[in-house]
Amino acid sequence: MTFQTFKRFVLMSVFFMTTSVVIYAQQSTMQGLIGQSLAKLQQPTSESILNCIAEMKRIDDMFPDSIQPKFQIALQSLNYSVMNPHAPQTENLLKETEETIAKMENIKHADPSDICTLRGFLYMVRIVQNPGQNGQRYYLEVMQDYEKALKLNPDNQLAKQLQQKFFEGMKQQTGKPVNKKQRLFYPRTISPEPKKRVAT
């Protein structure tokens, strides 16, 4: 190995090491900002959730290639919407959530289980907005999205909690529990198992 080649090799090694350190530092900064914002939701109110959404959007602007800010924007928008299904801001938040989910679907390292969970939650909010009109329209979508989310990632706690809430809500509406046979009756397409999730 000549001196010039060796020098080039060292410079490239230093470059990649520096890049890795910068990326790690950026991820740590992003995680810290997200954590600070979510810490304000210990006792969530409509106002605090809206503030959290605004903060997450700013974080997303700072880290446009990251999934987590987008996930939190969608999740907190849905949390607000399910608490305030007929508030003036709700419809715009739901439209933005649809757009955010679409963006996440186009990012390679996005977790498909998380995407299914958010989509199921979105349809569930639509049912809460108008049970009579949207119940039959979105019922199957909610069921299938939560089941697919859990098929892709059985440890998805958010999907488990939302699915349970959905079953409880349907039981209250109909007076009958949604049993396993009913759930298995509905056709569903399961995507291939995802690769191990990479932190972003």
Regions found by a protein language model. Give the residues of each.
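Short glycine/proline- and aromatic-enriched beta-strand/turn motifs that initiate or cap beta-hairpins
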Residues: V21-S48, M56
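Amphipathic alpha-helical repeat scaffolds of TPR domains
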Residues: Q27-K40, M62-N84, H109-N130, N156-K171, ...
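N-terminal segments that cap or nucleate solenoid repeat domains
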Residues: N51-M62, P69
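Structural marker of alpha-solenoid helical repeat scaffolds
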Residues: M62, I107-K108, L152, T189-P192
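Alpha-helical adaptor scaffolds
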Residues: N92, E99-K148
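TPR/TPR-like (Sel1-like) alpha-helical repeat modules
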Residues: R137-L150, Q157, E168, Q173-K195
